[in-house]
A protein has these predicted regions:
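Cysteine-nucleophile active-site neighborhood
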Residues: 880-925
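Glycine/proline-enriched, intrinsically flexible loops and inter-domain linkers
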Residues: 1-881, 895-906
Length: 925
């Protein structure tokens, strides 16, 4: 034997980290003890079901671990005939399912891919960079699967953002600073790359002061025939594509696997990666080209671990030439090149004969592509630097993840002593038993208006519009549901919905993504909290118009550092067990997830966190929003007769049927704040009110309402007609339909003989107990008054002069030609081209290349030629050159000052009566 090289030690430290290899979730559980309680029998029954499933699947000889528990639900559902659309391949960077997409009235087979990602550690250290690369990393996972990412969601957790700065814990940034800068970072990256972030929610819980929760979830899609899945063979070449390599992010994977202490803020800053959204936008453009993706045998994105992981995972045997890795600057040694986590890089494995063609296609998209490795027959990973072999390890050893780890588990007893007959019953029992000071105070109040204002002013129920409006929700022109609905844009959407990214055609196919999680319930009972997270995420999609049969889940687990404490291990054990029971009960499987198991700071721990994300494919004609639509419509409450999973499923099926029948004008799933929270949020969007039915008393308004639905019916429908419809469809068993009242034009809520002024409630909701002071969005009365007094601008003059230019060039239809130049940082060229196509023009999208001086000269000449062959120049928006130096569009204007381009533009505008348009950066140019 020999002593290991330094680079080998650093690679093993990275490769075997909890972040990269889920070592906590794969730790072998040697014993599981359930503490004595009224719930012991139910928990033990859940464990017995898990063991039964293991036996049915032939997995009883596999190590018993959290990873097995987290993934076995989907395995079981697939075995019994569900989840048939799941794509199974060697590439598993993102969840991937086959879906049928309507393209111009014809079905096409596509892959829908989705992924959630956390950047808790880097965001806690450097909020802007950590949050921005959270989104960048999330995008690259489906992107490596060849999908075009078109939707993003952000769910975060913070401590007390009102805490005075002087009371901040030593070694910590103020919570308000983290929240603001993280929002700026995430939104900056999304806005630059051109990704619509249509659902944003921040959760507040005092225990997130231990370490922030920063989750990004994205959805992408690609036509299935454009994706090639093959195992790389000996002799295949690995290209490094995209950004160059620097020292940023070194140690990020290992740092993310550690708990924090008072020194972390000072010692971990270099572990935070530096995002470069315009570079990743180029990768998105390249991977959207079928002639590119059909060359790729296998792809992996550069995230944690850099070269050692991204390339190291592509094949069993690899010879990697670190000298070939493009560098941001000189001075990097072999170890740094091997484990740097510089962003916006992709590794692709190609057949040798395809390398030159791929590099040429990459250059067309202004991207560098460099051969850096060769696949070998021998299963060893070797890295060479400056003539020396600095890594030479066997695949078997690398894949071992180090010595096996073992732990004992003690599942804690629930805080209450209530009896439950099933997992579902337990989840509802825990929800009702949970003490909520806000709800308790509300229930003690005599005034309905005071109660509603107090409830809606709570920070976790209040409007977060000031935060949401920092994110671009419309880029890509595919958004179906805006973040806030109604004429007043105030009712929060329950899920994000967008059309699939079909180029050159029309589609009615949409995807949806929702989430569920309550940190207070999960802290009270992790088992019930996880179960209810799944239920809530599914209910939100049902209310939005999707069908449970088409739904899939992915989980985000985030827990304290478990150490060797059985009680600490019991929390994720209980949560993942609860989530498993929910999957089995509702027939919806989790086919992906991300675990982060280092949420501790000194003696502080994050709350037990299992966020459930639910996604589905559907048709735009079924999409339903929660805001009330019209006065005079009847409102019903669809619930279940008992807290059994079969009854909840029956309720889901009933709502799906009613939406499909076309009689639902608005639908909202119930919230922890009860009917009161649901009704107020539904009312504010259009400024409508509710007159409650005489059978509804005030106490019912504030009871938790998870899994239930408030529905506004179409004209002529009421509770009785709904019951008849459900009976005729055989869907009425165990479903409870209650008349809630009517929608009114008066902006007030009437219930139990009391009247609440919803304007007063809305004001409390928008103030959010001070949340508006952190994320303001409303203008002051003085500003509104000034805006209302601005005089109207009108123009009266001669008609536009007649067109005197030459005959229009192009096809026989005489359609005008449009050139759309794409500069580094532009991001709405697809939207612009589609708009011109709809108007009858013929657009040409041209990517400006600035990789070398010769490339700039060639781009200058080509753009000038295209302008002379066109009647319109359209400069798309975005963030060209990162809007630097000194503001927007400087790079674009500099390029247009080139003599050839200037002369072509002058000829277009002055000699040929052509047009020049711009949006965002393009308008500024």
């Amino acid at each position: 034997g020999r002593d290991p090289y330094e680079t080998e030690l650093r690679i093993l430290d990275t490769y075997w980290s909890d972040h990269c290899r889920h070592t906590t979730f794969t730790t072998v559980l040697t014993s599981i003890r359930v503490d004595e309680s009224f719930m012991r029998a139910e928990l033990e029954e859940s464990l017995e079901l898990y063991h039964k499933i293991r036996r049915e699947l032939g997995r009883d000889e596999k190590p018993l671990c959290l990873m097995d528990l987290a993934t076995i639900g989907a395995r079981y559902l697939r075995k019994i005939g569900k989840l048939d659309d799941l794509e199974v391949s060697e590439e598993n960077n993102a969840c991937s399912i086959f879906v049928d997409v309507d393209v111009d009235g014809q079905p096409e087979k596509w892959l829908l891919q989705f992924k959630n990602e956390t950047h808790n550690h880097p965001t806690e250290i450097e909020p802007f960079g950590g949050a921005s690369t959270c989104l960048g990393g999330a995008i690259r996972d489906p992107l490596s699967g060849r999908s075009y990412v078109y939707q993003a969601m952000r769910v975060t957790g913070a401590g007390d953002i009102y805490q005075p700065v002087g009371e901040t814990l030593a070694g910590k940034l103020p919570q308000r600073v983290i929240s603001r800068k993280a929002a700026a970072g995430y939104s900056s990256y999304g806005n630059q790359i051109g990704l619509a972030t249509t659902h944003v929610r921040e959760i507040y819980h005092p225990d997130y002061v231990a370490k922030r929760l920063e989750v990004g979830a994205v959805v992408g899609a690609v036509k299935a025939e454009n994706v090639r899945r093959e195992t790389p063979a000996a002799g295949d070449v690995v290209l490094l594509l995209g950004g160059r390599t620097g020292r940023d992010g070194i140690g990020g994977a290992t740092g993310s696997s550690k708990e924090h202490n008072t020194k972390s803020l000072e010692t971990c800053s270099s572990e935070v990666q530096k995002g470069n959204a315009p570079e990743e936008r180029k990768l998105e453009r390249l991977f959207r080209r079928p002639e590119v993706t059909r060359l790729i045998k296998k792809s992996n994105d550069f995230g944690a671990g850099g070269v050692s992981v991204a390339i190291g995972e592509l094949a069993d045997g690899l010879d990697i030439n670190l000298d070939a890795v493009p560098k941001k600057y000189d001075g990097l040694d072999g170890t740094e090149l091997a484990i740097s986590e510089s962003q916006e890089r992709m590794a692709v494995a190609l057949a040798p004969e395809d390398v030159d063609a791929f590099i040429a296609l990459a250059h067309e998209e202004n991207l560098e592509a460099t051969p850096v490795a060769v696949v070998t027959e021998e299963p060893r990973v070797r890295m060479h630097w400056r003539g020396d072999t600095i890594v030479d390890v066997s695949r078997e050893f690398l894949a071992s993840n180090g010595a096996p780890k073992h732990a004992a588990v003690a599942v804690p007893a629930p805080a209450d002593e209530s009896f439950a007959e099933s997992a579902c019953d337990r989840a509802f029992e825990a929800t009702s038993e949970l003490t909520d000071p806000v709800v308790d105070a509300v229930c003690d109040a005599d005034s309905l208006e005071v109660s509603l204002a107090a409830l809606m002013g709570d920070i976790n129920r209040a409007s977060n519009k000031g935060l949401v409006e920092r994110f671009d929700s419309t880029i890509g022109a595919a958004t179906v549901l805006m973040p806030f609905g109604g004429a007043r844009q105030l009712t929060p959407a329950l899920a994000m919905v967008a059309k699939l990214p079909v180029l050159g055609g029309k589609t009615t196919t949409v995807s949806g993504l929702s989430w569920g999680f309550n940190p207070y319930l999960s802290s009270y009972d992790p088992y019930a909290g996880a179960y209810m997270a799944v239920l809530d995420s599914v209910a939100k999609l049902v209310a939005t118009g999707f069908e449970r049969a088409n739904m899939y889940l992915t989980f985000q687990e985030y827990f304290e550092k478990l150490r060797q404490d059985p009680e600490r291990w019991g929390k994720p054990m209980a949560a993942v067990l609860g989530a498993l029971m929910a999957q089995i009960d509702f027939g919806v499987g989790a086919i992906g997830g991300k675990d982060s198991m280092s949420g501790s700071f000194e003696d502080l721990d994050v709350p037990p966190t299992l966020v459930s994300f639910a996604t589905a494919i559907g048709n735009i004609d079924r999409i339903t929003s929660p805001e009330l639509k019209e006065a005079g419509d009847n409102l019903i409450w669809v619930s279940f007769e008992d807290a059994l999973a079969s009854s909840v499923c029956a309720t889901f099926d009933a709502v799906e049927h009613l939406i499909g029948a076309g009689i639902v004008r608005a639908c909202a799933s119930g919230a922890y704040g009860g009917l009161a929270e649901t009704l107020v949020k539904a009312a504010v969007g259009n400024g409508l009110g509710i007159t409650g039915d005489e059978d509804i008393d005030m106490g019912q308004l504030f009871e938790p309402a998870y899994g239930t639905f408030v529905i506004e019916l179409a004209a002529g429908e009421d509770a009785q007609s709904v019951v008849t419809r459900l009976e005729d469809a055989g869907l009425d068993a165990n479903v409870d339909v209650v008349e809630l009242g009517q929608v009114t034009s008066a902006y007030e809520l009437t219930c139990d003989g009391q009247v609440a002024d919803l304007a007063v409630v809305q004001e409390a909701w928008e103030r959010g107990g001070g949340l508006e002071s952190v994320f303001p969005y409303r203008t002051s009365p003085e500003e509104r008054a000034a805006a209302e007094t601005v005089p109207a601008i009108s123009f009266e003059g001669e008609a536009a002069p007649a067109y005197h230019g030459p005959a229009l060039l192009g096809d026989t239809s005489g359609a005008p030609r449009v050139v759309i130049p794409v500069f580094p940082g532009n991001n709405c060229e697809y939207d612009s081209a589609a708009a011109f196509e709809r108007a009858g023009a013929v657009p040409t999208v041209y990517v400006v290349n600035n990789l070398t001086p010769d490339a700039v000269a060639e781009s200058t000449a080509e753009l000038a030629r295209l302008i002379r062959a066109s009647q319109i120049v359209m400069i798309p928006g975005g963030f060209s050159g990162g809007d630097e130096p000194d503001g927007s569009a400087k790079f674009i204007t500099a390029f247009f000052r080139a003599p050839e381009v200037t002369e072509a533009v002058r000829d277009l505008l002055q000699a040929r009566d052509g047009l020049m348009l711009g949006i965002c950066n393009g308008f500024q140019a």
